[in-house]
């Protein structure tokens, strides 16, 4: 998918008293795109609108050059758009396969077809090279494994665009690296991925482009290999002077970021080369 969001796109957050302006005049090419910005900048609002979770008051969304209306998550799913938001719900008394198909069960003549669902569940988990067993109770999985199941669930309808809202939130460095390896596989299969993420080491480890949003406006779109932590943080913070930029560049936190990114890069490389799991998904 190639996404174009035209200027003056408004969306009302649920429970909010007034409309929140988000202005975008950018092409998002078929890449693994990371959207970054401060809290309240409009990152999650943007992907909620594309996902059909929020409706724009006005403004336009174009997919592949055609103006579209996305009135619901169900319609987004039909259009080949899948999403994973924070706080995905699972039924702890069900296994992995049943959670993957929750609300989308396969039936044959009115009878639930567990064999077909298990087969399809193995297939989507194999796509991610995950060794999670389809018959495992979801309650037995770690936070990182649950996030993997949430990502696998997006693949059931073979989407062309996948939206991820903070996919590595609350994960350890090693868990994050494993989930990021799965996300890279989605991109390697030719799918477009748009990811909201606060953690810059994760952003730099997997993204092709970084979109910076500040106060509802896209302030820059950067090729990841051509930018730096300092430049992105300065843009997020609205730094305008050379002195302010130098203060950011000299911050000791950057050494920690660089070390964390190197660890993530090594872990992702190993996962991509050898597979994150040891075997194919089993019952």
Model regions and ranges:
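N-terminal active-site segment of His-dependent metallophosphoesterases
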Residues: 1-40
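Glycine-rich phosphate-binding loops of nucleotide-dependent enzymes
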Residues: 35-39, 44-283
